[in-house]
A protein has these predicted regions:
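Transmembrane helices of ABC transporter permease
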Residues: 21, 25-38, 73, 79, ...
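Alpha-helical segments in transporter systems
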Residues: 24-45, 66, 70, 85-89, ...
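ABC-type nucleotide-binding domain
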Residues: 336-585
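Helix-loop-helix
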Residues: 58-63, 158-172, 242-315, 320-321
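Short intracellular "coupling" helices and adjacent cytoplasmic loop segments at the cytosolic face
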Residues: 3-7, 57, 93, 101-125, ...
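Hydrophobic/aromatic residues in alpha-helical transmembrane segments
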Residues: 43, 47, 84, 88, ...
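An intracellular "coupling" helix at the cytosolic face of ABC transporter transmembrane type-1 domains
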Residues: 20-24, 109-113, 129-138, 142, ...
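Membrane-integrated ABC transporters
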Residues: 1-40, 47, 55-67, 84-88, ...
Length: 585
């Protein structure tokens, strides 16, 4: 228990440095709220004086002066409150802006393993909802952490100066109300934590369903997905209802205690007035102080609730910061080889998986060769790409790449040697030029861009666009067809010169003729580049020097197209299923 408390304290301290640069606002916000509270505490005393002294004596001049003073306090209080809100908001927004900036930078530096563990949907929620919750909590804290206690305890002190005997009722009421607030807070904390987890689950499901909507419809899984989403949504609803039921008890319980105290104060006050120990104005002042305490305790209830949610959000964010960032300067074990790619008895299992995704894979590729990779769904093709780009490291065996017989010295150098065109063609809003030079710091000439477009078989449609290289690209490349997007992403990879080029099923939207021209151009123009093409089509791999056949993580073959066709039953079955006419012949 103590260890957990120390961990939470360390986590909160880790986020406190974001107040740096906003120290003035952090001090002035609560300070102005303190002034506002002081002005409010004077109002009941002024009203009591009007009732007890001015009205009985019909002193109009004095009455006008007191009413004017009340208006002055109201105007000054409004100005002070607005000023306090400005400073509090500035500190909260500034804090969150820097926090969000650093959190985004941290997320971008996480390893693939950590991103998979935290999940994309959870990271999005932490970057948006959690940071906003922290901003709300800070804003409310700076506005209320001095104001509410000052008014509560100030009202008790002022009540004591009026009637020490009746102050006991005030103290008893405050103790009971604090007990209600903190009991509810203790009950609500774990529920709010579960609500955050339920939110992550819904966001993750929504993201998956939107991205895979075509597949879901194609396989008739719409009803099943709707049922799964409804179940997750119901869990979220149940948690919100449970939290709502508990939090809704706070207000009626508070009013019950306060109104009970109010009846007691009025009853005792009436007796005190009858004995001549208390005036009517003083009783009115006591009632006003009682209502002020009620208002501030309700605000404190909201503050405690907001802070609890903020602490939960802060905990989720610090979990991200506690992850080690990927260090591109990490030194790798050096080795030498005549091959460009050497895989020796490699086995890899994902951290959350029970079975290996790749098991005992063994092959080697010469520099400038064309390696084809084929296999069914779940065979391990995408896993191989993640290992080739060093997003993961195999638990057994080894995988190494070489240039001029030497392996890369650092993780950053390894990544710079490998260009990957992913399955999903991603284009960003901007221009064709801005997409082609994405991530490249050195200046790239137009000739180099056109050469990459020529090789990728994209120069024909780019030249027809208005503005050509400076033609507009909409978000996600929506103004291009699937095949055009794939060719542009391949061209982008070619602009960033590297000795290895991996096409992860990134020619699937191209017709056979265009694909053949593209692969031929890469072979002719980039003779030193080692090409790895992952494809579902055997026709795409005919020209490959070697083809790696995978099935459920196991290597079933490693040979040329013709050799596999003669020797491997699985490859032959795949090929003939795609070319029925050859089988019949």
């Amino acid at each position: 228990m103590r260890a957990n408390a120390l961990l939470e304290k360390r986590r909160m301290k880790a986020l406190s440095h974001y107040f740096k640069g906003y120290l003035k606002e952090t001090i002035l916000g609560p300070l102005f709220k303190l002034f506002e509270a002081s002005f409010e505490l004077l109002v009941p005393i002024i009203i009591a004086r009007i009732v007890d002294t001015i009205i009985p004596h019909h002193d109009k001049n004095h009455l006008y002066m007191m009413v004017g003073l009340l208006f002055l306090l109201a105007i000054v209080g409004m100005f002070v409150a607005i000023t306090a809100q400005y400073f509090s908001s500035k500190a909260a927004v500034g804090y969150t802006r820097q926090l969000t900036k650093d959190l985004f930078k941290k997320i971008m530096g996480l390893s693939k393993e950590d991103r998979d563990q935290l999940t994309t949907s959870s990271l999005v929620t932490r970057l948006t909802s959690d940071t906003y919750q922290i901003q709300t909590g800070i804003n409310q804290f700076l506005r209320l952490f001095l104001r509410a206690p000052i008014i509560v305890f100030g009202a008790i002190i002022m009540a004591f100066t009026i009637s020490p005997k009746m102050t006991i009722d005030f103290l008893l009421m405050v103790v009971i109300l604090f007990a209600i607030v903190f009991t509810m807070s203790h009950l609500l904390n774990p529920i709010y934590a579960k609500i955050r987890q339920a939110t992550d689950r819904i966001v993750n499901m929504t993201r998956q369903q939107l991205e895979g909507v075509r597949v879901i419809r194609a396989f008739g899984q719409v009803a099943a997905e709707e049922q799964e989403f409804a179940a997750a949504n119901q869990d979220y609803t149940d948690l919100q209802i449970k939290a709502g039921h508990l939090s809704s008890l706070v207000t009626p319980l508070t009013y019950l205690v306060v109104n009970g105290t109010l009846i007691l104060v009025i009853w005792q006050g009436n007796l005190e007035i009858g004995r001549g120990l208390l005036s009517q104005g003083m009783l009115i002042a006591l009632v006003n102080y009682l209502l002020q305490i009620l208002t501030e305790l309700l605000k404190m209830t909201m503050l405690v609730t907001s802070l609890n949610q903020s602490f939960i959000s802060a905990k989720r964010i610090t979990e991200v910061f506690e992850k080690d960032s990927e260090n591109l300067a990490t030194e790798l074990i050096q080795s030498e080889s005549a091959f460009a790619l050497a895989v020796k008895d490699m086995t890899f299992t994902y951290p959350t998986a029970a079975e290996p995704s790749l098991s005992h894979i063994d092959f080697s590729v010469n520099a400038g060769d064309f390696l084809g990779v084929i296999g069914g769904t779940g065979s391990g093709k995408s896993t191989l790409v993640e290992l080739l780009t060093h997003l993961y490291t195999p638990q057994e065996g080894s995988l190494a790449i070489f240039q001029n017989q030497h392996s890369p010295k650092t993780l950053g150098e390894w990544r710079s040697w490998v260009n990957v065109v992913p399955q999903k063609a991603e284009l960003f809003q901007g221009t064709i030029r801005s997409n082609l030079i994405l991530g490249i710091r050195d200046e790239v000439s137009d000739n180099e861009l056109w050469r990459a477009l020529d090789i990728a078989q994209a120069s024909d449609f780019v030249s027809e666009k208005e503005g050509q290289l400076d033609a507009k690209v909409e978000a996600f490349g929506r103004n291009f067809s699937g095949g055009q997007r794939q060719r542009l992403t391949i061209a982008r990879a070619l602009v960033r010169k590297a000795p290895f080029l991996i096409l992860d099923d990134s020619t699937s939207a191209l017709d056979y003729l265009t694909e053949a021209k593209l692969l031929s151009a890469i072979h002719e123009e980039l003779k030193e580049v080692t090409l790895v093409l992952i494809s579902q089509r055997t026709n795409s791999l005919k020209a490959a020097d070697k083809i790696l056949l995978l099935d459920r993580g196991h290597q079933l073959g490693f040979a040329s197209h013709d050799e596999l066709l003669k020797q491997n039953d699985v490859y032959r079955a795949i090929h003939y299923s795609q070319h029925q006419e050859e089988k019949e012949a």
